[in-house]
Every structure is written in C-alpha cells, then in structure tokens.
UniProtKB/Swiss-Prot annotation:
Disulfide bonds: none annotated. GO terms for cellular component: cytoplasm. Belongs to the aspartate/ornithine carbamoyltransferase superfamily. OTCase family. One of its GO terms (biological process) is citrulline biosynthetic process. GO terms for molecular function: amino acid binding; ornithine carbamoyltransferase activity. It comes from Neisseria meningitidis serogroup C / serotype 2a (strain ATCC 700532 / DSM 15464 / FAM18). The gene is argF. L-ornithine binds at residues 166, 230, 234-235. This is Ornithine carbamoyltransferase.
Length: 331
C-alpha cells in the first residue's frame, strides 16, 4: 500500500484498504515502541505544527511521534501564527513548504487545511477542523480493534450527543468506510449534515456497513460494543448555549443506565477528551454551580469505571499520528 507523500485531510479521501493500512502500521509502530526496538524512519525531516485551536493531546502526539522517529518539530501557537491575519494561507503554505517536510494544521475551517495542500508542496496533516477529525478516527479505530476481540466489520458502536461537528461527522464516515454497524443517537437538529449522511451511505454501499440515525439514545446503544460521546459545547461557543444544549441533550448523557441499555456487559466507553465528568475543573465547577450537574456528557461513575478505555484511546493518538507521518514521509 503506497501512502507516500499523501495528505491526510479526511477519511473520505481514502479507501477502506488504505485506512486499514494506517491501522496496521500504527499497531506495528506501537509494538516496536513498547518493545524498545523502534526504528527511526524520519531522520532529518522537519514538521511544522500550526495550531489555531489549542490542544493537549494533538500537540503532544505529533511532537512525541515525530521525535520518536528522529524528526524535528516547530510548534506555531495560536497567538504566534500570522496565518490568515497578516499573511494569506496561500503565502504561509508556500513559505512553510520551502522549510518543512510536512505540515500539521489544527484550526477551524476545513477549507483552510485544503488550501494549505494546494500550495505547500509537502504533505499536510489535519489535526482537527470544525468538520473533520481524521487523526482521532484512526486512534478510535485502533482502540476499538484492540478491545473488540472481533474484526471491525463485525463491531457495532454508537455516538450519542451533539453529532453536527467533527466527531459526529468523522465517526459516521469511519464506520461506513470500515463496514461497521454505526449508530448516531441525537436530536435530529444535532445530526450530521445531509451531505455527510449521504457520503456515509455511499461508502456503506461499498463496504456493507450498517448506518442508523435515531433520536432514541437507548435504541442507538442496543447491542453495541462501544459507546462514544463528546462535549456538548464546543470550543469557542458562548456560555449562554449551555442551558439550551443541556435541555436538548439530557437524555443522551452517558450514565450507568445508558451503558446497561446496550445489553452488552462488555460494552466499553470512549471519549476523545477533554471530558466534563466531574467538578475538578473550573468549567466543571461552574457547570455544577450553574446547572447542578456533576459531570455533563458522561458521569464520573462511567468515566472512572473499568468499561472506560479513554486513556488507551488517548495514547493511541500518538501511535496513529506516527503512522500517518511515517507512511507519508518515512524512508
């Protein structure tokens, strides 16, 4: 499978076989790192990390993955980057493309990362946009593969909550591309766009995936192997939307009762993080004082239970991001 010099922007750009090749490479690289026998395949390479949105996991994953493989990284933080402010995306791409072997972008519009690819002349990796989160999808798929005990095309998962943005969009496409049984449980007003749903159905025709969108959370999770969720209010949204979102999504909160509704005693909980699962953050305490909720999209009981595999999932961000870079740039 030749993934050399490929951009990594969204899963819709890849065949099921190519996505599986990334997962296989990630598993191989993970095993090599754990065994202390990792071979550096990116010596002398340099990666630019453009962050218009802050991040813990994505930044750390790219930096550790690159350094493990012998590559250098430059982190361009939100306050330091001139992209789109004093310098156009087109010009930024052409400058960085002369200095770096690859560029990671984490920001807002998908159009921005797509434009970078047109002018950079080097592989561009999408660390997150409003529309898609493809590196997270590889981590999620690898984590499900590790914990499922069966092939992904025999695995079922549900995403419950606000499904309009990058996680809902991307998980729907992931399941469709890999022939999985994928369900979205959300109010219809918070479903992915018609275009995303149509793309998922088109992919499912090729792979045999089963796609379900429902407003009934219990129906969504019935007989699944994994239950995913994400925060109910996204980065940059005003505090005023919290009450509206809580009213809309209270029935989609991942509680022990919702986990039990799967009917699967081995069901696992997944979350891309950060999660509002208790009062131990400033935002979590504010939510508790304002709305009386100790934990929002997931309860502390579920988050800290043996069913929670969120930290395996977080670790796999690094191994899968490493696979993307090695596939594109490795010797």
């Amino acid at each position: 499978m030749n993934l050399k010099n490929r951009h990594f922007l969204k899963l819709l750009d890849f065949t099921p076989e190519e996505i599986t090749a990334y997962l296989d490479l990630a598993a191989e690289l993970k095993a090599a790192k754990k065994a202390g026998r990792e071979i550096q395949r990116m010596k002398g390479k340099n990666i630019a990390l453009i962050f218009e949105k802050t991040s813990t996991r994505t930044r750390c994953a790219f930096e550790v993955a690159a350094r493990d493989q012998g590559a250098g990284v430059t982190y361009l933080e939100p306050s330091a980057s001139q992209i789109g402010h004093k310098e156009s995306i087109k010009d930024t791409a052409r400058v960085l493309g002369r200095m770096y072997d690859g560029i990671e972008y984490r920001g807002f519009a998908q159009e921005t990362v797509e434009e970078l690819t047109k002018y950079a002349g080097v592989p561009v990796f999408n660390g997150l946009t409003n529309e898609f989160h493809p590196t997270q999808m590889l981590a999620d798929a690898l984590t499900m593969r590790e914990h499922s005990g069966k092939p992904l095309n025999q695995t079922a998962f549900a995403y419950v909550g606000d499904a309009r943005y990058n996680m809902g969009n991307s998980l729907l496409i992931l399941g469709a591309k890999l022939g999985m049984d994928v369900r979205i449980g959300a109010p219809q007003s918070l479903w992915p766009s018609e275009g995303i749903i149509a793309a998922a159905h088109a992919a499912a025709k090729e792979t045999g995936a089963k796609i379900t969108l429902t407003e009934n959370a219990h129906e969504a999770v019935k007989n699944v192997d994994f239950i995913h969720t994400d925060v109910w209010v996204s980065m940059g949204e005003p505090k005023e939307v919290w009450q509206e979102r809580i009213d809309l999504l209270k029935d989609y909160r991942v509680t022990p009762e919702l986990m039990a509704a799967s009917g699967n005693p081995q069901v696992k909980f997944m979350h891309c993080l950060p999660a509002f699962h208790n009062r131990e953050t400033k935002v979590g305490e504010w939510i508790y004082e304002t709305f009386g909720l100790n934990g929002v999209e997931v309860t502390e009981e579920v988050f800290e239970s043996p069913a929670s595999i969120v930290f395996d999932q977080a670790e796999n961000r690094m191994h899968t991001i490493k696979a993307v870079m090695v596939a594109a740039l490795g010797d």
